[in-house]
Amino acid sequence: YNKDFPIYPGELVVIQAPPKSMKTMLVQNWVNSFKRPTYFLEMEMSPRQIWKRFIQIEMGWSEEELSRKYAQSNFKMADKFDWLNVDYQPCFAIELEKRISMLPVKPEIVIVDHMGLMLSKHRDLNLKMEEIAGALTDVAIKHNVIVVAICEITKSAMQEGMSISSVRGSFRIAYNASKILSLTTSKNQEGDVTNMVIKTEANRERGALNVLLKVNGIRIEAPTEPRRPLDG
């Protein structure tokens, strides 16, 4: 996106966003562009949904194009995603490290979508989020990986400008996270998301992020700047 905002191994990055803000699609675009060994814990979408999106992002296909290609007998895409391991089974936060350790290829990036769907023995929301945030931080540090965790926040809280640290049950997330990013979207008259803004809410390192992105079908891209006329 033409921005300098480094994220380092050993860091927990939390993305706070309200429901239906395309947060999963955003991180799918990210990891697909990096194509680094990735463990993607997806607890909200079905395997069919998640892989359909990944293929569309990679190939730039519409749903109709994907359906036509899929109907062909020689359709094959697995080799394009040998860097990706998707897991759909929710687990306790403490079990995540064991799952990663058992992978044949150590991941460089771990995605958790989303934190609220992880299992916990705690019924109290504060204790649950404290446990999960602490475990994700441990995974990032012990395995020297980047952990990106999505955390849902209410629309009213986002509209009031509240950060994740001021939402009930989320103080420990803010305490543990190396970086906290907020995601907001704008829609057209038909209700389709057309743009999104990613901003830094907290960062232990130097640097801030405030970027406007354009939603182009299934891809999320930086807006193209109009060409300047040549002088003279």
Where are these regions (language model features)?
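Cytosolic-facing regulatory segments adjacent to core modules
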Residues: N2-D4, M25, N29, R36-K106, ...
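Pre-Walker A (Motif I) flank of P-loop NTPase domains
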Residues: Y8-V13
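The Walker A (P-loop) glycine that initiates the GxxxxGKT/S ATP-binding motif of P-loop NTPases
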Residues: Q16-A17
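C-terminal regions of RecA-like/P-loop NTPase motor modules
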Residues: I94-V110, V139-H143, K155-G232
